[in-house]
Amino acid sequence: MGQVFLLMPVLLASCFLSQGAAIENQRLFNIAVSRVQHLHLLAQKMFNDFDGTLLPDERRQLNKIFLLDFCISDSIVSPVDKHETQKSSVLKLLHISFRLIESWEYPSQTLIISNSLMVRNANQISEKLSDLKVGINLLITGSQDGVLSLDDNDSQHLPPYGNYYQNLGGEGNVRRNYELLACFKKDMHKVETYLTVAKCRKSLEANCTL
């Protein structure tokens, strides 16, 4: 009986520590989701502002090109639809989100074009991407319990973003900026979806459907 009483403080301390870790983990998820939501809204606004400066024919042509083209981040293997997203583990969604954010560290610096609003936004984006990357890395560390499990595709290096956009051809800055902004908006939407699902799973909510 004495041994049971001796173990009680240890068990209670362990319970409180576990509860504290869960609360901190949820706090980090809340911050990460909030930040990527802001980035997604910012990306949407920047794309809409740029799209609004195009002539109708120019807009249609660029949209057709973009639909046939691809974003460099498409090299990152990720869920193809909502069903696959919901089947993916929390750790997998976090790793994909980390890779997507990391893939924009360089190109976010090239979003600066001849518009004062976009210059300010671009500076904000670089800082927010860096903060979000650190936050996702903390979530990965807290979710993997010391075991790093990556698919073979996760170890592949993406080709340099700069080289890709330097080879777009004679259309110049208009197509380059259109694709940058469209891809950025697309990828921030992906990360927002993945982090929202991962956060829901960690909170043990009954319904995490998209």
Curated annotation (Swiss-Prot):
Pfam families: Hormone_1. Residues 1-22 form the signal peptide. GO terms for biological process: animal organ development; calcium ion homeostasis; growth hormone receptor signaling pathway; hyperosmotic salinity response; magnesium ion homeostasis; positive regulation of growth; positive regulation of phagocytosis; positive regulation of receptor signaling pathway via JAK-STAT. Keywords: Disulfide bond, Hormone, Metal-binding, Secreted, Signal, Zinc. GO terms for molecular function: growth hormone activity; growth hormone receptor binding; metal ion binding. Disulfide bonds join 71-183, 200-208. It is found in: Secreted. GO terms for cellular component: extracellular space. Zn(2+) binds at residues 38, 192. PANTHER family: SOMATOTROPIN (PTHR11417:SF2), SOMATOTROPIN,PROLACTIN (PTHR11417). Belongs to the somatotropin/prolactin family. Growth hormone plays an important role in growth control and is involved in the regulation of several anabolic processes. Implicated as an osmoregulatory substance important for seawater adaptation. This is Somatotropin-1. It comes from Oncorhynchus nerka. The lineage of its organism: Eukaryota, Metazoa, Chordata, Craniata, Vertebrata.
